[in-house]
Each structure stands twice: as structure tokens, then as C-alpha cells.
């Protein structure tokens, strides 16, 4: 079999000159994924970094060469160029299911589509588990590795960098924490049942359109919660048949979970009750950005401008009620236009489309209520992803245009000739003794500050040659200039404070906010900001309001300056990263990942110590002080949780944990008692 696979790979070798690379569309476990053209058809080209181990490349190629299924991404060929390896794979124009569900723009979809995606994912996994002679385990099933094609109607599994042969009982941890089965990160031996657990979390995600454990950033905290039996909250009014299947698949004991073949059979029966999965979803996935427009011109999903209304939406407005085949097609998604130009005109119609039925329950009730039979567009949620990720969703057109306006304005200001800096120097000032200088004027100071008149305090280089005036002037002019700038700045600051205090004391004085030394520069810069950040117009004839308005304008100017500096710093950083050697870049990224894992372990350890101390105090025992471990003594990120915490009299350490094998609900999480092998 290995020889046959090697021969197939040799036959599938592609000359790199036949490939025309286009924009990057994402990244996988070991490399970048680019859109490309090969033999007059669109393909996805996965580039493996030079530092990637050859065995990882060979593993993915070997596994893909064995796979041929409509719900699994196909491998067309392999190529190499400049010490980099490229895999030519099937292109999924719809992007990942994760971006579809949780991206900036959230296209609408029906319950029929959700059930169809879950069924197709189950069929692809069942195919892997049933392969001969060596079945395969994916080990990293999550929406990021599920791609949409055919306008959202078809789903395909990708990223086989974690696939393993089922013939070997695997013990190394792979996958993401929120979708990872407890036996995987626990360190126990696991089988294909870990994919079934991950599939159940994906099913919950497409039903709720929420990210599991979204509010928890620490991966080890998520693993600890899953180990203790916590699961995502059950969906109210969810069909019992779907709920029973979902809860059976995420059971703690792997042997209690059904097989993927059984899941496929159940899903085939479920999808019969929901028609409409063959309806195309009108959206386009371009450069990690989803663009949705209906044929009648209405936008099928709310853009970023509705993010401010997020607090007004309750779970009731974002969930669905199962429908029968008779009425599943009746409730089509229709959302009014929400473009920037028509936002004001359509406020009433838009509000009527998204008004929740139980407003205000988002923060008070942990459960998600499903009271509508369709997916409405959901405003963008607050993202936890790093803004330094070069594969994040691109900025909106308005933000890009605003940034270009700022840059162009700064360039014009930099090119504008500035007034020449001049110094008025007393003719015989440097020839006078200190006593003569002090007696020359009753108002003169000993430092000679009154002898200098600075007409401009901007940091402009002094280029005027004053050597012809006096031999000592040229030597001391730079120092005098710097002191003069400092004095002038302090005087201006004191004068401005005194002036503002006088205005506050006399409320009858009108202050014109535009009468400032910036000649309207701050006003024009403030108008570049987003509407929610722009200064509110002041109250007429109110001195305090005028001062607040002026302060806001100053802060807006500072904000734009800082934001622009951040942009240039990020651009400079990106250029340095591109110029950096790939091996060095990978080493630095690996170091950053290890540092983050170290911080996560330290945080988890401190949390467990606090819980242990609280339990000891509650039981009337005085906890023994434990020396704080050295960071290097912390457990490896992939090791299972410390057993001296896990086996504390059979009870959980988290508040509200379950003892004695009973089930309870704590803070909206379904708690399942952990399983301990005899």
C-alpha cells in the first residue's frame, strides 16, 4: 500500500511553473494557503514552511492520497520550489464554516442548512473511520477545518495534518481545546470516538451560532472544565431527537458514544424533516471577507454598522425553532438594507426586523432560547483574536478610506513649507557681564530669557549661519534655542490654564470652539473619526460644555496620531517579518507560543491553588502552604491534569461541582460526572 501511494505521488507531481499564485486565503497547521490557478481551474495551494518537518508533509500527502470522498477536500498534486513544498488541493470558494458563522458579516441560513452540514461532516468522518486496511482518525474536527462549496450547500473536511492511522492507539494530543475530547488531553489512549465528541460540539455550534467556551481565553481552563464534565448549554426548545444525539456524542466515556456510522443513519432521518438545504446561500468569500447580497438588492446580513446594537439583542432573536417540512421553506430570510448611506432612512424598518422578543435576557439567563425558525443576521461580536494575525478579516472599506485620508493629510502637512525660525538677539548681549545684564532692565532675568523671542516653537532644525554676527553666537545658539522653546511652551501652558480657569469662573463668556491656535486642524481631523467617536457639538452659551468639546477635539487629534503611528509600526513590523529568515521567524513564533502556554499553565495553577485553599477552609482544615513552583517545573502543556487535584475525594474543585454521580446545572453549563476507570 505504501509503495502504491508513493507511485501515485510521483505521478501527481506538478511543475511549479504551471501554477499561478494569487492572494492568500488562510493558513493551516504548517503553512500558508493561497488561491491559485492550475490548468485553467481554481485550486488551493498549501505552502509548507521550510522549517516544517518532512514527515509532517509526507503524512498529509499520504493520507490525502488515500482519500476520495465528496465531503473531503481532494488532492490534485504536489510541487516544490525554492526549498518549499506545495500541495495543490481542491478550492473551496465559500471559505471556512467558522468564518461563515462568526465572521464580521454573518450570512443568513436555515435550520435545513445546519442539519445538512452536520450530516455531510458525519458522512466524511464515517468514511475515514471505515477505510481499509487502516482506518483514519482526523483528531481536529472544528469549523475552521470545514469548508463550504457550491454556494454553501456542500461541506468538505480539510487539514489532514493531524490525521492518524486508527491501527495505532494514539497518545499525543492534537486538536483545539474547545472541541477536544477529554481523553485526548487527559493523556489516555483514544480511538476514533474523539472525532465523535468533536462532531457534537460542531453540531451545537451550527445550531446556536455561538463559539463554545468563548468567554474563556485559557485553553487549559477549557480542558479542565471539559474534564469535570461541563459542556456547552443545551438549547431550549431544541428537538429532543437532535438533543439526545448531541448529548450522547459528547459523553465523557468514549465507549458510551455512538459510532459515526450510527450518527449518519440518524442524521439521514432528521434531515427529512427540514427541506431547503439545496437553496443556494447568496454570499461571496473574498480575501477572508464575506460579502452577501440578494438578487433583489437587499443585503442578506447586517454589516459592521450594526455592531453598536449588539447589547439590544437577546438570545431569542438569534436562535431558531425546528420546523416541519411543510413550513420550513416559508420563512425565508429577508433583512432590510443596512448600508452606511441608507442607515438613517431605514432605521424603523431595520429595528422591526431585529427587535428581540425577550430583550435584556442575554446577560441574565445563561441558556439560549430558540423562538424563530430562521437565522437572522447577528451583529459582529467582540473578537478575542489578535490584531497582529495577518490572516484576520480585512478592514471595512470605510476604515480603509479613513486611513488613507489620514495618511494623505499627514503627507500634505509634512510637505507644506513652514515659517522660518528666527531669533532676535540683543546686539551686545553676549558682551555684557552678569551684573550689567541684570541692571540693564528691571524686568530682565539672570538667565537672559528676555533676550530671546521665539516666533515658532516647532522642532525645526536651525540652519541660519550666525557666525558673521558674533563668534560666540554660533556656538551657543542651539542651546539657547532649546531652552527658549521649553520656556515658551511652559508659558503657553500656564497661560492656557489661567485662561480656561477664567472662562469657568465667568459663565457669561461665550467660547467659540473653532477659535483656537490650530486653525481648524483639530476640527477637520475629528471629522475623520467614526461617528461614534466624533465630538458632540457643545451646548451654546455653556462654558463648561465648550471646554469639554475642546478637550474632546484635542483627544481626537491625539487618538488619530496614535492610531496612525500604530499603523506605521505594524507595517514596519510586517516588513521586518517578511525580510526575516523563515527558520528564525518560526523559532520566534514557537518561543512566543511557549511563553503563552507558560502563562496559561501558571494561571491555571494559581486558580487551582485558590480553589483547593477555599475547600480546605470550608472543611475546617487549615491548608498547608505550598511553595510556588518554578515556571520550568510546570507540567508540559500536553500532559494530563495533576491527579492530586483530580482525585480529591471524588468531588470537583470548581464551585458547584457534582459529587456522588448526580447531575446538576451550574451557571448554565451541563455538568456530567467524570468517569474514573477502576
UniProtKB/Swiss-Prot annotation:
One of its GO terms (molecular function) is protein serine/threonine kinase activity. Pfam families: PK_Tyr_Ser-Thr. InterPro entries: Kinase-like_dom_sf (IPR011009), Prot_kinase_dom (IPR000719), Protein_kinase_ATP_BS (IPR017441), Ser-Thr/Tyr_kinase_cat_dom (IPR001245), Ser/Thr_kinase_AS (IPR008271). GO terms for cellular component: cytoplasm; cytosol. The keyword Transferase applies. It catalyses: L-seryl-[protein] + ATP = O-phospho-L-seryl-[protein] + ADP + H(+); L-threonyl-[protein] + ATP = O-phospho-L-threonyl-[protein] + ADP + H(+). Its cofactor is Mg(2+). The active site is at 140 (proton acceptor). Residues 296-322, 339-365, 431-455, 616-647 are annotated as: Disordered. ATP binds at residues 25-33, 46. GO terms for biological process: apoptotic process; cellular response to lipopolysaccharide; compound eye development; defense response to Gram-negative bacterium; defense response to virus; dorsal closure; immune response; innate immune response. Residues 353-364 have a biased composition (Polar residues). The keyword Transcription does not apply. Residues 19-271 form the Protein kinase domain. Keywords: ATP-binding, Immunity, Innate immunity, Kinase, Magnesium, Metal-binding, Nucleotide-binding, Serine/threonine-protein kinase, Transferase. Belongs to the protein kinase superfamily. STE Ser/Thr protein kinase family. MAP kinase kinase kinase subfamily. Component of a protein kinase signal transduction cascade. Mediator of TGF-beta signal transduction. Responsible for activation of the JNK MAPK pathway (basket, bsk and hemipterous, hep) in response to LPS. Component of the NF-kappa-B pathway; relish-mediated JNK inhibition involves proteasomal degradation of Tak1; certain targets of Relish that are induced during immune responses may facilitate destruction of Tak1 and switch off the JNK cascade. Participates in diverse roles such as control of cell shape and regulation of apoptosis. PANTHER family: MITOGEN-ACTIVATED PROTEIN KINASE KINASE KINASE 7 (PTHR46716:SF1). This is Mitogen-activated protein kinase kinase kinase 7.
